[in-house]
Protein backbone atom coordinates (compact mmCIF):
# COMPACT_ATOMS: atom_id res chain seq x y z
CA UNK A 1 0.00 0.00 0.00
CA UNK A 2 1.39 3.38 -1.02
CA UNK A 3 1.02 6.29 1.38
CA UNK A 4 0.52 9.62 -0.34
CA UNK A 5 1.82 13.00 0.68
CA UNK A 6 -0.14 14.85 3.35
CA UNK A 7 0.93 18.34 4.34
CA UNK A 8 -0.22 19.25 7.84
CA UNK A 9 1.95 22.27 8.61
CA UNK A 10 0.22 25.07 6.69
CA UNK A 11 0.35 28.30 8.76
CA UNK A 12 -0.63 30.35 5.71
CA UNK A 13 -4.12 28.86 6.09
CA UNK A 14 -4.39 29.28 9.87
CA UNK A 15 -6.18 31.99 11.80
CA UNK A 16 -4.74 33.52 14.97
CA UNK A 17 -6.33 30.87 17.22
CA UNK A 18 -4.90 27.98 15.23
CA UNK A 19 -1.46 29.60 15.12
CA UNK A 20 -1.56 30.13 18.87
CA UNK A 21 -2.55 26.50 19.41
CA UNK A 22 0.54 25.35 17.50
CA UNK A 23 3.14 27.60 19.09
CA UNK A 24 2.03 28.64 22.59
CA UNK A 25 3.90 25.88 24.44
CA UNK A 26 7.19 27.63 23.74
CA UNK A 27 5.99 30.51 25.93
CA UNK A 28 3.09 29.47 28.16
CA UNK A 29 3.12 26.38 30.38
CA UNK A 30 -0.61 25.79 30.46
CA UNK A 31 -2.22 23.26 32.76
CA UNK A 32 -4.28 20.45 31.27
CA UNK A 33 -7.38 22.60 31.73
CA UNK A 34 -5.75 25.41 29.78
CA UNK A 35 -4.67 23.08 26.99
CA UNK A 36 -8.21 21.72 26.74
CA UNK A 37 -9.52 25.28 26.62
CA UNK A 38 -7.30 26.12 23.64
CA UNK A 39 -8.46 22.97 21.88
CA UNK A 40 -12.06 23.62 22.91
CA UNK A 41 -12.08 27.15 21.51
CA UNK A 42 -11.22 25.69 18.11
CA UNK A 43 -13.37 22.57 18.32
CA UNK A 44 -16.56 24.26 19.49
CA UNK A 45 -16.34 26.89 16.76
CA UNK A 46 -15.78 24.24 14.10
CA UNK A 47 -18.73 22.24 15.42
CA UNK A 48 -20.90 25.35 15.17
CA UNK A 49 -19.95 25.73 11.51
CA UNK A 50 -20.65 22.03 10.86
CA UNK A 51 -24.05 22.33 12.55
CA UNK A 52 -24.80 25.47 10.57
CA UNK A 53 -24.18 23.60 7.33
CA UNK A 54 -26.37 20.75 8.55
CA UNK A 55 -29.16 23.16 9.48
CA UNK A 56 -29.17 24.56 5.95
CA UNK A 57 -29.52 21.03 4.57
CA UNK A 58 -32.49 20.36 6.86
CA UNK A 59 -34.51 23.39 5.79
CA UNK A 60 -36.23 21.65 2.82
CA UNK A 61 -37.58 19.03 5.25
CA UNK A 62 -39.93 21.64 6.67
CA UNK A 63 -42.04 21.16 3.57
CA UNK A 64 -42.93 17.69 4.85
CA UNK A 65 -44.45 19.24 7.97
CA UNK A 66 -46.37 21.74 5.85
CA UNK A 67 -47.70 18.97 3.61
CA UNK A 68 -48.82 16.99 6.65
CA UNK A 69 -50.60 20.04 8.03
CA UNK A 70 -52.35 20.74 4.74
CA UNK A 71 -53.46 17.12 4.37
CA UNK A 72 -54.52 16.26 7.91
CA UNK A 73 -55.07 19.62 9.57
CA UNK A 74 -52.27 18.97 12.05
CA UNK A 75 -48.60 18.09 12.04
CA UNK A 76 -46.21 16.39 14.44
CA UNK A 77 -43.64 18.98 13.30
CA UNK A 78 -40.84 16.43 13.62
CA UNK A 79 -38.72 18.17 11.02
CA UNK A 80 -39.19 21.57 12.61
CA UNK A 81 -38.15 20.09 15.95
CA UNK A 82 -35.02 18.56 14.43
CA UNK A 83 -34.03 21.82 12.76
CA UNK A 84 -34.72 23.80 15.94
CA UNK A 85 -32.54 21.47 17.99
CA UNK A 86 -29.66 21.91 15.54
CA UNK A 87 -30.12 25.68 15.51
CA UNK A 88 -30.02 25.87 19.30
CA UNK A 89 -26.92 23.68 19.37
CA UNK A 90 -25.15 26.17 17.11
CA UNK A 91 -25.59 28.95 19.67
CA UNK A 92 -24.51 26.68 22.52
CA UNK A 93 -21.35 25.64 20.66
CA UNK A 94 -20.50 29.26 19.90
CA UNK A 95 -20.90 30.23 23.54
CA UNK A 96 -18.67 27.32 24.53
CA UNK A 97 -16.01 28.68 22.17
CA UNK A 98 -16.19 32.06 23.90
CA UNK A 99 -16.10 30.31 27.28
CA UNK A 100 -12.97 28.35 26.34
CA UNK A 101 -11.30 31.53 25.08
CA UNK A 102 -11.97 33.19 28.42
CA UNK A 103 -10.53 30.16 30.24
CA UNK A 104 -7.27 30.56 28.32
CA UNK A 105 -7.11 34.22 29.35
CA UNK A 106 -7.88 33.37 32.96
CA UNK A 107 -5.09 30.82 33.14
CA UNK A 108 -2.46 33.01 31.48
CA UNK A 109 -3.32 35.99 33.69
CA UNK A 110 -4.24 34.05 36.83
CA UNK A 111 -1.86 36.16 38.93
CA UNK A 112 -3.68 39.36 38.04
CA UNK A 113 -6.37 40.72 40.34
CA UNK A 114 -9.95 40.91 39.09
CA UNK A 115 -9.69 38.14 36.49
CA UNK A 116 -12.37 35.67 37.64
CA UNK A 117 -12.83 32.08 36.56
CA UNK A 118 -16.27 32.82 35.13
CA UNK A 119 -17.08 34.11 31.67
CA UNK A 120 -20.05 36.19 32.83
CA UNK A 121 -18.06 37.73 35.69
CA UNK A 122 -15.07 38.29 33.41
CA UNK A 123 -17.11 40.35 30.96
CA UNK A 124 -18.80 42.26 33.78
CA UNK A 125 -15.46 43.10 35.41
CA UNK A 126 -14.13 44.50 32.15
CA UNK A 127 -17.35 46.45 31.49
CA UNK A 128 -17.16 47.94 35.00
CA UNK A 129 -13.42 48.67 34.81
CA UNK A 130 -12.81 46.53 37.87
CA UNK A 131 -9.61 44.70 36.93
CA UNK A 132 -5.84 44.76 37.41
CA UNK A 133 -4.29 47.86 35.83
CA UNK A 134 -1.64 45.64 34.22
CA UNK A 135 -4.24 43.73 32.24
CA UNK A 136 -3.58 44.07 28.47
CA UNK A 137 -5.44 46.83 26.67
CA UNK A 138 -6.17 44.67 23.61
CA UNK A 139 -8.03 42.13 25.75
CA UNK A 140 -10.04 44.94 27.32
CA UNK A 141 -10.95 46.26 23.87
CA UNK A 142 -12.02 42.77 22.77
CA UNK A 143 -14.61 42.69 25.57
CA UNK A 144 -15.81 46.26 25.24
CA UNK A 145 -16.35 45.79 21.52
CA UNK A 146 -18.44 42.68 22.24
CA UNK A 147 -21.61 44.65 23.00
CA UNK A 148 -23.59 41.61 21.87
CA UNK A 149 -22.33 39.41 24.72
CA UNK A 150 -24.97 40.01 27.39
CA UNK A 151 -27.93 39.17 25.14
CA UNK A 152 -25.99 36.17 23.82
CA UNK A 153 -25.33 34.95 27.36
CA UNK A 154 -29.00 35.24 28.32
CA UNK A 155 -30.00 33.29 25.24
CA UNK A 156 -27.45 30.59 25.99
CA UNK A 157 -28.58 30.32 29.63
CA UNK A 158 -32.20 29.86 28.60
CA UNK A 159 -31.52 27.39 25.79
CA UNK A 160 -29.37 25.27 28.09
CA UNK A 161 -32.29 24.49 30.41
CA UNK A 162 -35.44 24.81 28.28
CA UNK A 163 -37.22 22.46 25.93
CA UNK A 164 -36.54 22.82 22.22
CA UNK A 165 -38.14 25.79 20.49
CA UNK A 166 -39.83 25.73 17.09
CA UNK A 167 -39.31 27.10 13.62
CA UNK A 168 -41.14 27.41 10.34
CA UNK A 169 -40.71 28.95 6.92
CA UNK A 170 -42.48 32.27 6.57
CA UNK A 171 -44.53 32.07 3.37
CA UNK A 172 -44.32 35.81 2.75
CA UNK A 173 -40.58 36.30 3.29
CA UNK A 174 -39.30 32.73 2.69
CA UNK A 175 -37.18 33.25 5.81
CA UNK A 176 -36.91 30.66 8.58
CA UNK A 177 -38.55 32.05 11.70
CA UNK A 178 -37.59 30.72 15.13
CA UNK A 179 -39.76 31.00 18.24
CA UNK A 180 -39.42 29.88 21.84
CA UNK A 181 -42.43 30.36 24.11
CA UNK A 182 -40.41 29.47 27.21
CA UNK A 183 -37.93 32.28 26.60
CA UNK A 184 -39.58 35.64 27.16
CA UNK A 185 -38.31 39.17 26.65
CA UNK A 186 -40.34 41.86 28.42
CA UNK A 187 -43.17 39.37 28.79
CA UNK A 188 -43.18 38.30 25.16
CA UNK A 189 -42.01 35.01 23.69
CA UNK A 190 -38.71 35.12 21.83
CA UNK A 191 -39.28 35.42 18.08
CA UNK A 192 -36.44 35.73 15.58
CA UNK A 193 -37.79 36.51 12.12
CA UNK A 194 -34.68 35.34 10.26
CA UNK A 195 -32.82 32.79 12.36
CA UNK A 196 -30.10 32.18 9.78
CA UNK A 197 -29.29 35.88 9.68
CA UNK A 198 -29.00 35.72 13.48
CA UNK A 199 -26.71 32.68 13.25
CA UNK A 200 -24.43 34.37 10.72
CA UNK A 201 -24.29 37.51 12.82
CA UNK A 202 -23.39 35.52 15.93
CA UNK A 203 -20.75 33.51 14.05
CA UNK A 204 -19.14 36.76 12.92
CA UNK A 205 -19.32 38.31 16.39
CA UNK A 206 -17.75 35.32 18.10
CA UNK A 207 -15.11 34.95 15.39
CA UNK A 208 -14.14 38.60 15.75
CA UNK A 209 -13.87 38.32 19.54
CA UNK A 210 -11.79 35.14 19.42
CA UNK A 211 -9.64 36.54 16.63
CA UNK A 212 -8.82 39.71 18.56
CA UNK A 213 -7.95 37.79 21.73
CA UNK A 214 -5.63 35.31 20.09
CA UNK A 215 -4.12 37.88 17.72
CA UNK A 216 -2.92 39.68 20.84
CA UNK A 217 -1.77 36.51 22.58
CA UNK A 218 0.26 35.65 19.48
CA UNK A 219 2.25 38.86 19.94
CA UNK A 220 3.23 37.66 23.41
CA UNK A 221 4.87 34.45 22.20
CA UNK A 222 8.63 34.22 22.59
CA UNK A 223 10.88 33.58 19.63
CA UNK A 224 11.58 30.03 20.74
CA UNK A 225 11.83 26.85 18.62
CA UNK A 226 8.72 24.66 18.80
CA UNK A 227 8.60 21.12 17.46
CA UNK A 228 5.91 20.68 14.81
CA UNK A 229 4.63 17.71 12.83
CA UNK A 230 4.81 18.91 9.23
CA UNK A 231 3.12 16.04 7.43
CA UNK A 232 3.57 12.72 5.70
CA UNK A 233 5.76 12.75 2.63
CA UNK A 234 6.26 9.86 0.23
Protein language model regions, located:
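Acidic, Ser/Thr/Gly/Pro-rich intrinsically disordered interaction regions
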Residues: 1-92, 100-234
Amino acid sequence: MTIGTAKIFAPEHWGSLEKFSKFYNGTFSLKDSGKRAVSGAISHFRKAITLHNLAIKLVPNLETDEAELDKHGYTSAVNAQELSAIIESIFLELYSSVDCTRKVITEIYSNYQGIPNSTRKYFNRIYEGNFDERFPEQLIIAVREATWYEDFRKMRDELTHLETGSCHKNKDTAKIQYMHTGFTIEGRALVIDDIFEKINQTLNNVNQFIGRVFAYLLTQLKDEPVLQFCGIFH
